């Protein structure tokens, strides 16, 4: 499978034999993040042109999953976790423990590579910000978002997600 690869190269560009060879020879790691946190991060990074978070969310919902940006598209439609046997699923917020394990498995020195992820003040601030932004949404938008990300919420354990019922 010696084709020119770019960071955007998708498995669909390869034939079945090449796909099986790649999936069998790589350690497959999937990094996941709560869908609502992904929306907030995208909005804060200015990727949405909407003036308010509520109108940004409405733009996302109006775009649907087929026209959705990779920044907020449901993970299940991007990464196919039911079709690809991932070796590791690393959840945002648990990087220190999980990346340490991955580096150890790869035979790399863990302590010298990993930065400290200990700023609980940042986590608290992000939680507060999430609560504020979630409160901007209408009941209808909250229901639509839960439906939009239904398969992500079912496939991954986002137990503290604002979108979980």
Describe the predicted segments one by one.
Residues 1-165:
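Membrane-interface amphipathic segments in extracytoplasmic regions
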């Amino acid at each position: 499978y010696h084709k020119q690869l770019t960071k955007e190269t998708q498995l669909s560009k390869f034939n079945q034999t090449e796909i099986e060879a790649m999936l069998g020879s790589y350690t497959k790691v999937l990094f996941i993040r709560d869908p609502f946190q992904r929306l907030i991060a995208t909005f804060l990074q200015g990727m949405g042109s909407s003036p308010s978070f509520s109108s940004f969310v409405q733009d996302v919902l109006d775009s649907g999953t087929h026209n959705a940006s990779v920044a907020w598209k449901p993970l299940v439609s991007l990464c196919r976790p039911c079709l690809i046997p991932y070796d590791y699923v690393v959840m945002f917020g648990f990087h220190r423990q999980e990346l340490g394990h991955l580096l150890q498995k790869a035979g790399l020195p863990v302590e010298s590579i990993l930065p400290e992820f200990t700023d609980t003040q940042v986590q608290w601030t992000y939680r507060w910000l999430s609560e504020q932004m979630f409160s901007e949404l209408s009941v209808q938008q909250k229901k639509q978002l839960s439906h939009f990300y239904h398969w992500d919420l079912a496939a991954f354990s986002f137990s503290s997600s604002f979108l979980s019922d």
